[in-house]
């Protein structure tokens, strides 16, 4: 048995790749998991619901305001110090064999708590441009796994420890009884911009089938009036839809792009330009450069522009699926390092 301490949360983009890694590790070897979650956030809720066998410890932390010298950061920094002390106490009690971190401010807290404990730390960065937490903890990491080759440019100081894997994906054996549709996603909380844009698109297009995860029951009911649209407030078994999708329309969160690339589904990306450190825009532009996507900026997003992008994307056709799930590669690398 190996004892794994893990953190990566605050958003689904950090959480789901981490769960993919942990679930794959548990298939390869017996594990006991200590999971650090952000109090009141998605990681606490999802992990307690889906993995009651994990020991969950919540930390009361929030991300820092930008710029970092923002006056409100004084109070947040005090919370960070308390969270580091709590995390260190829990780590000393749990005695992990390995620590797996996938970004978000809680990863920075746990990484700093563990830096002098002699336990191997493994990082995964989902975004093209590494976040503050990953850059803070990188110097203490045994290996840094990345979703994009270009991320190496931002981690040159630790280039010997960087390994390009892609973004870990949670897979399911479930199948959906649908074929030849466009998958529309707005992220784990939905997107009013995408929902309202697509409502106008649906008024104009009836010859294409859409499956739309809206993020809210209200929007799902509103969009279900269109006969060619299957709308859900939230899709649980996302991978079963990715497997059958012909194209996609979404924000540009790293885990969404990771799924898009893994399953070989070309996409129309509308990056949220308010994301921290312009992560979504950078992710979208890199996916476009690699030939996986067409980027439509928020200020240029009109129903007609989206229709034109859908047409180009569907003509492109599906791309070859990745041969191996990045979660499998990462699990193999971790076990190879600690055995």
UniProtKB/Swiss-Prot annotation:
The record's annotation in Gene3D superfamilies points to: Glycogen Phosphorylase B (3.40.50.2000)
Write down the membrane topology.
Peripheral membrane protein
Top EC group: transferase
**Cellular localisation:** Cell inner membrane
Principal localization reads membrane
Q: Which domain of life is it from?
A: Bacteria
Q: Which reaction does it catalyse?
A: di-trans,octa-cis-undecaprenyl diphospho-N-acetyl-alpha-D-muramoyl-L-alanyl-D-glutamyl-meso-2,6-diaminopimeloyl-D-alanyl-D-alanine + UDP-N-acetyl-alpha-D-glucosamine = di-trans,octa-cis-undecaprenyl diphospho-[N-acetyl-alpha-D-glucosaminyl-(1->4)]-N-acetyl-alpha-D-muramoyl-L-alanyl-D-glutamyl-meso-2,6-diaminopimeloyl-D-alanyl-D-alanine + UDP + H(+)
Checking InterPro entries in the record gives: GlcNAc_MurG, Glyco_trans_28_C, GlycoTrans_28_N
Chain sites annotated for binding UDP-N-acetyl-alpha-D-glucosamine: 11-13, 127, 170, 188, 235, 280
Assigned GO CC terms: plasma membrane
Pathway field of the UniProt record reads:
Cell wall biogenesis; peptidoglycan biosynthesis
**Could you say which EC number(s) this protein's record lists?**
2.4.1.227
Pfam families documented for this protein: Glyco_tran_28_C, Glyco_transf_28
User: From the UniProt record, which GO molecular function terms apply?
Assistant: UDP-N-acetyl-D-glucosamine:N-acetylmuramoyl-L-alanyl-D-glutamyl-meso-2,6-diaminopimelyl-D-alanyl-D-alanine-diphosphoundecaprenol 4-beta-N-acetylglucosaminlytransferase activity; undecaprenyldiphospho-muramoylpentapeptide beta-N-acetylglucosaminyltransferase activity
BP GO terms, sorted: carbohydrate metabolic process; cell division; cell wall organization; lipid glycosylation; peptidoglycan biosynthetic process; regulation of cell shape
Q: Which UniProt keywords apply?
A: Cell cycle, Cell division, Cell inner membrane, Cell membrane, Cell shape, Cell wall biogenesis/degradation, Glycosyltransferase, Membrane, Peptidoglycan synthesis, Transferase
Repeat as UniProt keyword: no
Q: Which PANTHER family match?
A: GLYCOSYLTRANSFERASE (PTHR21015:SF22), UDP-N-ACETYLGLUCOSAMINE--N-ACETYLMURAMYL-(PENTAPEPTIDE) PYROPHOSPHORYL-UNDECAPRENOL N-ACETYLGLUCOSAMINE TRANSFERASE 1 (PTHR21015)
Q: Which family is it part of?
A: Belongs to the glycosyltransferase 28 family. MurG subfamily.
Described purpose of this protein according to its UniProt entry: Cell wall formation. Catalyzes the transfer of a GlcNAc subunit on undecaprenyl-pyrophosphoryl-MurNAc-pentapeptide (lipid intermediate I) to form undecaprenyl-pyrophosphoryl-MurNAc-(pentapeptide)GlcNAc (lipid intermediate II).
**Would you tell me the protein name for this molecule?**
UDP-N-acetylglucosamine--N-acetylmuramyl-(pentapeptide) pyrophosphoryl-undecaprenol N-acetylglucosamine transferase
């Amino acid at each position: 048995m190996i004892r794994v301490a893990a953190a990566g949360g605050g958003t689904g983009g950090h959480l789901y790749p981490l769960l993919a890694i942990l679930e794959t590790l548990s298939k390869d070897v017996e594990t006991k998991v200590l999971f650090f979650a952000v109090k009141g956030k998605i990681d606490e809720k999802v992990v307690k619901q889906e993995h009651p066998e994990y020991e969950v410890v919540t930390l009361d932390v929030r991300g820092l305001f930008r710029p970092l010298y923002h006056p409100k950061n004084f109070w947040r920094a005090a919370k960070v110090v308390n969270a580091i002390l709590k995390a260190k106490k829990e780590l000393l009690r749990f005695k992990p064999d390995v620590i797996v971190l996938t970004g978000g401010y809680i990863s920075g807290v746990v990484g700093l708590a563990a830096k002098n404990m002699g336990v191997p730390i493994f990082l995964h960065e989902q975004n093209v441009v590494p976040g503050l937490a990953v850059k803070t903890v990188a110097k203490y990491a045994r290996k840094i796994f990345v979703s994009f080759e270009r991320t190496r440019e931002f981690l040159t100081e630790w280039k010997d420890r960087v390994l390009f894997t892609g973004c870990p994906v949670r897979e399911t054996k479930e199948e959906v009884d649908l074929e030849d549709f466009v998958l529309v996603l707005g992220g784990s909380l939905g997107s009013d911009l995408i929902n309202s844009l697509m409502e106008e698109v649906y008024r104009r297009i009836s010859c294409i089938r859409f499956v739309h995860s809206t993020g809210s029951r209200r929007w799902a009911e509103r969009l279900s009036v269109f006969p060619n649209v299957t709308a859900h407030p939230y899709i649980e078994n996302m991978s079963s839809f990715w497997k059958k999708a012909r194209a996609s329309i979404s924000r540009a969160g790293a885990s969404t792009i990771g799924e898009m690339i893994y399953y070989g589904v070309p996409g129309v990306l509308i990056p949220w330009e308010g994301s921290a450190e312009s992560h979504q825009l950078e992710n979208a532009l890199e996916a476009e450069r690699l030939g996986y996507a067409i980027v439509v900026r928020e200020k240029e997003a009109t129903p007609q522009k989206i229709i034109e992008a859908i047409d180009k994307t569907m003509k492109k056709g599906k791309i070859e699926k990745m041969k191996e799930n990045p979660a499998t590669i990462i699990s193999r690398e971790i076990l190879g390092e600690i055995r």
